[in-house]
C-alpha cells in the first residue's frame, strides 16, 4: 500500500464529486440507483476518508461513494454509539455462543483459505446475487485494495478452523465495518457476533462510533442494523439518534 503520509494536510476541498449514470439498484428490485463519487481517489487517505464517512460516504475497494438517487432516499447511513450500546437478549446469546473464537488482527493479504470461505459464504447466503461468482481478482479488488487504515480480522475456532473474516477501516472517530463473511454451516449468528466484537474494539480504542454503512427500511438484508442501539442515522445532512 502506498505511503499517503505526505497527503495528511491536504484540505478536504481538493476533492471533486460527480454523479454516476443510473444503474440497477442492488437492494430494491426494479429501482434505478445513482451514486455520488469522490475523486481523485489517490487523495483520499484515512483522515480525508474519515471526514467523508461522517458525511455519509462509504467505500468499495478504492471507490468512495454515497447514494445519490433520483427521487429516492431509502439508503440511510447509520452508526452505533459504542459507549452507550446495550445488547439485547438475542445479541447476548450470540456473544456467549462464540466466546471460544479467537480473533487475529492482520494486514490485508491474499489467502486461498480466505477466498474459499468468501466463496462458500456467497454461495450459501447470497446465491444468485452475482457476488457468488466473484473471481479471485474481483474478491481482491473489493476487499484487499485500500488507501486507508484497514485491518483484516480472522476468527478461528479452538481447533484452528477459520470461522469468519471481518474487514474493518480504522477512522479518526470510529471503526467502519466494511464487510464480513463467515462459514455458512456454522450456527449461532456469526454476523451479529462480528458487530458486537467491533463495538468492543471501539470501546478498547476509545473510539465513539461504529459505522455500519447503509440501512434500508424495506430491505430484509439490512434489517439487522436497526437492532444495535443507540443508533444514529444521517438524515438531511446531520446525525440524529433514532427513537428507542
From Swiss-Prot:
Q: Which family does it belong to?
A: Belongs to the R-transferase family. Bpt subfamily.
Localization recorded for this chain is: Cytoplasm
Q: Name one GO cellular component term.
A: cytoplasm
Q: Which NCBIfam families match?
A: PRK01305.1-1 (NF002341), PRK01305.1-3 (NF002342), PRK01305.2-3 (NF002346)
Q: Which UniProt keywords apply?
A: Acyltransferase, Cytoplasm, Transferase
Please list the reactions this protein catalyses.
N-terminal L-glutamyl-[protein] + L-leucyl-tRNA(Leu) = N-terminal L-leucyl-L-glutamyl-[protein] + tRNA(Leu) + H(+); N-terminal L-aspartyl-[protein] + L-leucyl-tRNA(Leu) = N-terminal L-leucyl-L-aspartyl-[protein] + tRNA(Leu) + H(+)
- Name the chain's protein: Aspartate/glutamate leucyltransferase
Amino acid at each position: 500500500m502506498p505511503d499517503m503520509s505526505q497527503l495528511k494536510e491536504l484540505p478536504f476541498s481538493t476533492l471533486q464529486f460527480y454523479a454516476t449514470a443510473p444503474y440497477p439498484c442492488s437492494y430494491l428490485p426494479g429501482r434505478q440507483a445513482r451514486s455520488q463519487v469522490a475523486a481523485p481517489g489517490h487523495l483520499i487517505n484515512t483522515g480525508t476518508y474519515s471526514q467523508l464517512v461522517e458525511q455519509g460516504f462509504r467505500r468499495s475497494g478504492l471507490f468512495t461513494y454515497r447514494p445519490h438517487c433520483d427521487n429516492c432516499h431509502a439508503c440511510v447511513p447509520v452508526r452505533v454509539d459504542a459507549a452507550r450500546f446495550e445488547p439485547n437478549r438475542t445479541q447476548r446469546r450470540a456473544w456467549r455462543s462464540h466466546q471460544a473464537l479467537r480473533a487475529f488482527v492482520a494486514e490485508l493479504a491474499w489467502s486461498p483459505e480466505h477466498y474459499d470461505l468468501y466463496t462458500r459464504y456467497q454461495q450459501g447466503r447470497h446465491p444468485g446475487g452475482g457476488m457468488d461468482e466473484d473471481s479471485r481478482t474481483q474478491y481482491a479488488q473489493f476487499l484487499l485494495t485500500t488507501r486507508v487504515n484497514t485491518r483484516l480480522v480472522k476468527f478461528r475456532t479452538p481447533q484452528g478452523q477459520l470461522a469468519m473474516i471481518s474487514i474493518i477501516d480504522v477512522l479518526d472517530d470510529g471503526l467502519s465495518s466494511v464487510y464480513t463473511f463467515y462459514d455458512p454451516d456454522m450456527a449461532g449468528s456469526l454476523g451479529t457476533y462480528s458487530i458486537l466484537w467491533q463495538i468492543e474494539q471501539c470501546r478498547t480504542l476509545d473510539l465513539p462510533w461504529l459505522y455500519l454503512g447503509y440501512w434500508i427500511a424495506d430491505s430484509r438484508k439490512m434489517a439487522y442494523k436497526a437492532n444495535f442501539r443507540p443508533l444514529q442515522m444521517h438524515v438531511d445532512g446531520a446525525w440524529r439518534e433514532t427513537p428507542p
